Amino acid sequence: MATVLSRALKLPGKKSPDLGEYDPLTQADSDESEDDLVLNLQQKNGGVKNGKSALGDPPEPDSDADVAGASKPHLSEVTPEGFPSEPLGGLEQKATSSLVSYVRTSVFLLTLVISMVLVLLCAFLIPCPPRDLHSTWSRRLGSQGGGDLSPLELADVNRDGLRDVLLTFVTTRNGTEGGGGSQPTADLVCLSGMNGSTLWSSPLPEEAQDVTCLDLIPGSVAKTICLVTGTRKMLSAFNATSGKILWTLNPNYLSNGTLAAPVVVLPDLDEDGVRDLVVLAIGELQPDLCFLLVSGRTGSPVGRPVKYNIVGVGNLIGPQVYITASGAVYILFGFGNIQAVALRDIFVQAQNRDSSPPSLQIEEPEWEKHRSVNLSELIDVYSDGVELLQLVKAPDSNSSSLLITTRQGLVLLRGQDLTPHWKLNLQGLRSQPTPGYFTDDQTLDFLLQTQDGVGMKKMTVVDGSSGSIVWSYRVPCHVKETPTTSAITSDQKSVFLFWAEALTAASLSSDDSSGAEPSGLYHLYLLHPAFPSVLLDLSNTTGIVTAAEVGVNDIWKDAFYVTRTTGMSPEGHTTSLVVSKLSLRWGLMEGQMVQLKETTPKIGRGELRRFLSRIKFVDSPYQM
């Protein structure tokens, strides 16, 4: 039918590209041939079909085609009017294009399926970091039968991303039938930071005065080692993961004295790739101080003991290691004063030779000027009623400053030249200042607690750059000394935590609360520099808080506060020993707001909660 229409439309005369176009030059010929076109269309079954007669005769050739001498068109050229002719190559291109599109779609879907399978495998096979679901926990460790306890130590011993709690304590146990009576025993215990369960426990031959956990191999992923210093002659290294003893210093090397202070970590002296140690022993019958260098790998002495005759009255200071900006290493120590000795001099005497490692040959000219005598090995640093010594980071410097607590107040010495940066006269200061960022100058400030009347103490924040007081408040507290701590936030601010009795409406409105009876209930208060007129009451306890530490969960940007408390019997004896943990972000949301004074505009509870909910804690050591 298409062929009939195609040949019928080839009218005589001038052809037009469109069927309905009017052309007066050819209109007459078109009228004459119109009847023939109608006859051809009516002969559907018996006449012309597909351009051929029923008898098979060839059709009459087109007059125009004969005149033009055109050849018979190919099949591909015979197409309905209005549809372009398409060569066979185009069909092949279409087929190829369809195949490429199919392959691309298949590859995309296959890649998508493989990616989804890998994601699901990672989600199920790779464990997520353990979330600290226990906002608070408390663990009772039994009755306490010893004297002074070592500070708490926080370290991730099981590599789960959460710091665990290590402490030592002495318990009283019934003796054997032959010995009779009660025998005190010392233990080193590691509690899980997740839920307070016991990870491991190890007996100690004597009571411990300090536990320090660190990696003795710098820059390695070696297992953490815990160094335990006893009150007499014990120095042992424990595997922090298992609690097994790695080595113990032979007490015969301390036959003429006892350990006077915790062990101090030094650079690598014997070049075995492990940092070494130094202990300070004091004579039993004379005030001689003896330094003993100890190998960090084996626990064996690195040379013989080195003795110094020290003249001074007061508390034992140090020893502490100080490394200057140029790399010179000094040991700070003293009795009521601060003196320094170059580690090079101790090493040369211990080895009984004139040479020392290149790392110990560096000198600090400004320190060397303070030698008491030209040939003396001792350097006079400070000598005015020293009670405590701290090393704190100095801003814009590779060295540390020396924060000295004296009977008259507080002094900050520059580490470069040992000159005073500022002094603060403050009576009644006996506890160690707590460093933290209170002002906006990125210089460490200090929280102090001083006795201020009967049953009262004053909490004070001192500006680290000038030594001026920027915040203070009197709180009721009948305990001579309670631990203070701080934690740094992501915006380079610090929250300060301290203990006091309840701040009632009467105590807030009155400046003189001396003589009030102790309530026996102590509250943990938090101070944030953004809201100096508000304290947050986070927790409370009826026991005596003997130690506290703050750790940071780096994964969840949270900080946790660990305390050790002891109960008191009516006779004044210590009873139970309790270790507790509190999540600070949880405490910030659940704590009670205590308004110290009215402000304009008034601080609302909703505004405070919105601010506190955005706080994130980071790990940044204050001391060097």
Curated annotation (Swiss-Prot):
Cellular component terms per the entry's GO annotation: Golgi apparatus; membrane; microtubule organizing center
Protein name: Protein FAM234B
InterPro entries: FAM234, FAM234A_B_beta-prop, Quinoprotein_ADH-like_sf, WD40/YVTN_repeat-like_dom_sf
Positions where Phosphoserine occurs in the chain: S16, S30, S33, S63
SUPFAM superfamilies assigned: Quinoprotein alcohol dehydrogenase-like
Stretches the record annotates as Disordered: 1-90
Keywords: Cytoplasm, Cytoskeleton, Golgi apparatus, Membrane, Phosphoprotein, Transmembrane, Transmembrane helix
Family, per entry: Belongs to the FAM234 family.
Organism: Rattus norvegicus (Rat)
Domain of life where this protein originates: Eukaryota
Matching Pfam families: Beta-prop_FAM234A_B (PF23727)
